[in-house]
């Protein structure tokens, strides 16, 4: 079975560490990126094309809602990830 690629975005470092540990501990998941702000995760989504993004709503530089809107509007994003909202 092919692994699901996962990216994480949260400005809370402890939350990112916790979620990263959980993802890395699951043999069916592959962590492809971590970000502390919306601009950074948007760049990761475009470059790494994750299957799933664990996304905080309230983040600096760009909030999670704006990230989702930009991804859905950007024709250069070939693979649309599933977003899971975290807080």
Describe each model-derived feature in a short phrase.
Residues 5, 13-33:
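Two-component/phosphorelay signaling modules centered on CheY-like receiver
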Residues 10, 56:
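Active-site residues of response regulator receiver
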Residues 37-40, 63-69:
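Acidic catalytic/metal-coordinating carboxylates
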Residues 46-48, 72-80:
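Conserved phosphotransfer cores of two-component systems
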Residues 48-54:
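Active-site beta3 strand of CheY-like receiver
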Residues 59:
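Receiver (REC) domain active-site loop signature in two-component systems and cognate sites
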């Amino acid at each position: 079975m092919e692994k699901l690629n996962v990216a994480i975005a949260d400005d809370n470092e402890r939350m990112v560490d916790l979620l990263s540990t959980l993802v890395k501990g699951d043999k069916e998941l592959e962590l492809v990126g971590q970000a502390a702000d919306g601009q950074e995760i948007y760049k990761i989504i475009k470059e790494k094309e994750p299957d799933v993004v664990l996304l905080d709503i309230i983040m600096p530089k760009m909030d999670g809602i704006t990230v989702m809107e930009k991804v859905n509007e950007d024709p250069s994003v070939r693979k649309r990830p599933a977003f899971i909202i975290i807080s």
